[in-house]
Amino acid sequence: MISTKDFRNGLKIEIDGKPYEIVEFQHFKPGKGGAFVRTKLRNMFTGRITDQTFRSGEKVKKPDMATKEMQYLYKDGEDYVLMDLESYEQMNVAADVIATAGGFLKEGETNKALLYNGEVIGIELPASVILEVTQTDPGVQGDRVSNATKPATLETGLGINVPLFINEGDKIKVDTRSSEYLGREK
């Protein structure tokens, strides 16, 4: 059990049998009445944000969650196929569970999968990944306006904006949280 005094951003809790992640919290101590904690919680199944208020000192259940190293094998229709590196068991994970992480998964790459009661509910990505540009228009000579960008498609199918000097075949570093170009890799 987790007390409200232990709340922090990123903490995972369980309410009504569903896992939530604390996105934001604030302790309140009004002049009259008991203290309470206001939170914004993200449902880890749907991604929906909800507001929830807890009385100070209230205890909530800690979810049965684990992280496990899993290898992304391939995409099967709308599903992503992941393999457990310990048991070599393969599982199909729906695209809506993987959500935006799907644009950063390369075949054969290992990532941490977030499991709830033995079922994959998300992928923990590193802060940035290195991906190859597979399609982009060539930069036009003399087109050098400051911070000018052009659209590019990466090897995973993700589309982002890159600077004009980036060409097809270049490897670039991409921020996994914002899908922004961070730099060129050698």
Swiss-Prot record:
InterPro entries: Elong-fact-P_C, NA-bd_OB-fold, Rib_uL2_dom2, Transl_elong_fac_P/YeiP, Transl_elong_KOW-like, Transl_elong_P/YeiP_cen, Transl_elong_P/YeiP_CS, Transl_elongation_fac_P. The keyword Protein biosynthesis applies. GO terms for molecular function: translation elongation factor activity. One of its GO terms (biological process) is peptide biosynthetic process. Pathway: Protein biosynthesis; polypeptide chain elongation. Keywords: Cytoplasm, Elongation factor, Protein biosynthesis. GO terms for cellular component: cytoplasm. It is found in: Cytoplasm. CDD domains: S1_EF-P_repeat_1 (cd04470), S1_EF-P_repeat_2 (cd05794). It holds the Pfam family EFP_N. The keyword Ubl conjugation does not apply. Involved in peptide bond synthesis. Stimulates efficient translation and peptide-bond synthesis on native or reconstituted 70S ribosomes in vitro. Probably functions indirectly by altering the affinity of the ribosome for aminoacyl-tRNA, thus increasing their reactivity as acceptors for peptidyl transferase. Belongs to the elongation factor P family. HAMAP family: EF_P. This is Elongation factor P. It comes from Maridesulfovibrio salexigens (strain ATCC 14822 / DSM 2638 / NCIMB 8403 / VKM B-1763) (Desulfovibrio salexigens).
